[in-house]
Amino acid sequence: MNSSRSVNPRPSFAPRALSLAIALLLGAPAFAANSGEAPKNFGLDVKITGESENDRDLGTAPGGTLNDIGIDLRPWAFGQWGDWSAYFMGQAVAATDTIETDTLQSDTDDGNNSRNDGREPDKSYLAAREFWVDYAGLTAYPGEHLRFGRQRLREDSGQWQDTNIEALNWSFETTLLNAHAGVAQRFSEYRTDLDELAPEDKDRTHVFGDISTQWAPHHRIGVRIHHADDSGHLRRPGEEVDNLDKTYTGQLTWLGIEATGDAYNYRSSMPLNYWASATWLTGDRDNLTTTTVDDRRIATGKQSGDVNAFGVDLGLRWNIDEQWKAGVGYARGSGGGKDGEEQFQQTGLESNRSNFTGTRSRVHRFGEAFRGELSNLQAATLFGSWQLREDYDASLVYHKFWRVDDDSDIGTSGINAALQPGEKDIGQELDLVVTKYFKQGLLPASMSQYVDEPSALIRFRGGLFKPGDAYGPGTDSTMHRAFVDFIWRF
């Protein structure tokens, strides 16, 4: 979208991030000067990714097609001094086009149709992925620690948290009791090509906590709470709106209860695994209302109201034998209601990737191609998986998607096409994820708790999406998104 409105350029935050990361690493010994020499742990992760995509617009707009390759280098350093430790991971990406080399940074969010290029990704960039210091001396429990800095917040389902973000996070993990509490806010992407935050991340603070217990061997039950304080500003009536402007603000609180039976443990020996979660979303939300004038979005006001919404996710997996597994899943996020009060949304920190198929490979819960958010969405899932020792695994997943309210929009997704009112059928998808693992044991033992993959692998992950009636006539009959990843950790 073109506009004559001038915008003051913002300086890149990447140099600040690198300076802060170096300060954290160099400052850690001062916290534990009497604890002895730090081990010298450093390395390099090499990732080569090929992406094929056609096309996310379903033929309703030009472009949206990719067939490109890139390399992603991630140098890291880790030091430990008694109860203190520090970690840094950088990133250097070069590609033939703006492809996705990182599952935590979706390439579906860009700065197109914006008044400036502050969020338009480049095909090559430098970044600081993680930089933190950690203290594990608050208690005598080995699974307790306090971490400060840009870090990966993650829980098993990937539906509450799975992202790199600036946070102060306390963790307490034992066999029978797990607990976490923290506060987080995104201040920068720490990339040389992105000077702007995504609009949903601007001026947004997260406060969260959870506690769970193992009430029987391999069976856990727990509760979660997450509060998001979104204090940003919406455009005034008459002002032009672009993709970098916020579309909603408010105070939202998620309250959830969950029960699992080795649901995300690919080594589980139980005959049946399960997961069940229910989440209530409450609070207040102001949604921006707009109209289109001469191909420009113009703010007309805001729609204010309370929020009373819910989401559920259920699943059952049968371990047929040591190699073969099969399962079903169902998820629903409410939608619609007066002034959108029943419109569920996720926390904004989710990836929706997990080991729900029972393999080491993490698969998107709502489709590798569709990549839906649990918002005005229901999804039925069938899957089968296979793994051979620690060397191979494969997952075949089928999804069927519907809207809950056929006159309301869904949340974010990997499809850039408008939905038609009055139609619920979003579509269906078939996913395939296949991985070959090799060269185990290259990483230092001290790093084993910070990585969740073997030292090297080759992986194919792809999805074929067939749109339903909700996308209307005249759209493409199919859309695909596929990746081939080669990863080697030195």
From Swiss-Prot:
Comp. bias (Polar residues): 102-115, 343-355
Keywords: Alginate biosynthesis, Cell outer membrane, Membrane, Signal
Positions of region (Disordered): 102-121, 331-355
Domain of life: Bacteria
Main localization category: membrane
Topological type in the membrane: Peripheral membrane protein
UniProt keyword Membrane present: yes
Protein name: Alginate production protein AlgE
